[in-house]
Amino acid sequence: MIVLVNNRDSFVWNLAEYASLFDRVKVVPNTITVGELRRLDPDGVIISPGPGHPLERREVGNSPEIVLEAGVPILGVCLGHQIIATAFGGKVGRVKPRHGKASPVKHDGKGVLRGIKNPLTAGRYHSLAVLEVPREFDVSAVSLDDNVVMGIRHRKLPIEGLQFHPESVLTEWERKEGLRIIKNFVEMSRNG
């Protein structure tokens, strides 16, 4: 089962729909505790997009603790990606707003990006981005039009973040590349 932590974004249900094609999905509020989450015994956790700043507790709930303590594979999308970065000591700041914009994204073809078109046209909906990557992470993807970090991956733990939205129609819809990214995460979660 995949647990999707809901940070109150309109894209939450698109992510849930994508993931449900490959496994059972339970959507939970971001106020769920790590203990409550562990009792659900998920194979993996998706930290959803949402409005606001990753350091604003009222907007992200217990998402940072989940990232650090859940002990299962984690994928963060947009705000979820930023939460991963800040939870591990990275910095997030303002960038030129990219709401409803598609950008070419070059990636390393590993992890959730395995087998994905490169460069990938990806849907972006953000005005914040990771400016300093935590030292335990590698940059896995970068936008080619403005050189913004679009993906990070922990060097040892199964934790990845994507600034772009794989569930957006702007992300290679015809080729189903966003769907493949979510499938890769579900498979990675099942395999531990």
From Swiss-Prot:
Catalytic residues identified in the record: C78 (nucleophile), H165 (for gatase activity), E167 (for gatase activity)
Pathway(s) of this molecule: Amino-acid biosynthesis; L-tryptophan biosynthesis; L-tryptophan from chorismate: step 1/5
Top EC group: lyase
SUPFAM superfamilies: Class I glutamine amidotransferase-like (SSF52317)
Ranges for domain Glutamine amidotransferase type-1: 1-192
CDD domains: GATase1_Anthranilate_Synthase
One GO term (biological process): L-tryptophan biosynthetic process
Enzyme Commission numbers on file: 4.1.3.27
One Pfam family cited in the UniProt record for this chain: GATase
Alphabetically ordered keywords of this record: Amino-acid biosynthesis, Aromatic amino acid biosynthesis, Glutamine amidotransferase, Lyase, Tryptophan biosynthesis
Catalytic activity, reaction form: chorismate + L-glutamine = anthranilate + pyruvate + L-glutamate + H(+)
GO molecular-function term, one example from the UniProt record: anthranilate synthase activity
Residues where L-glutamine binds: G50, P51, G52, Q82, S127, L128
General function of this protein: Part of a heterotetrameric complex that catalyzes the two-step biosynthesis of anthranilate, an intermediate in the biosynthesis of L-tryptophan. In the first step, the glutamine-binding beta subunit (TrpG) of anthranilate synthase (AS) provides the glutamine amidotransferase activity which generates ammonia as a substrate that, along with chorismate, is used in the second step, catalyzed by the large alpha subunit of AS (TrpE) to produce anthranilate. In the absence of TrpG, TrpE can synthesize anthranilate directly from chorismate and high concentrations of ammonia.
Subunit structure: Heterotetramer consisting of two non-identical subunits: a beta subunit (TrpG) and a large alpha subunit (TrpE).
UniProt-listed NCBIfam families: trpG_papA
Name of the protein in question: Anthranilate synthase component 2
Organism: Thermococcus kodakarensis (strain ATCC BAA-918 / JCM 12380 / KOD1) (Pyrococcus kodakaraensis (strain KOD1))
Upper taxonomic lineage: Archaea, Methanobacteriati, Methanobacteriota, Thermococci, Thermococcales
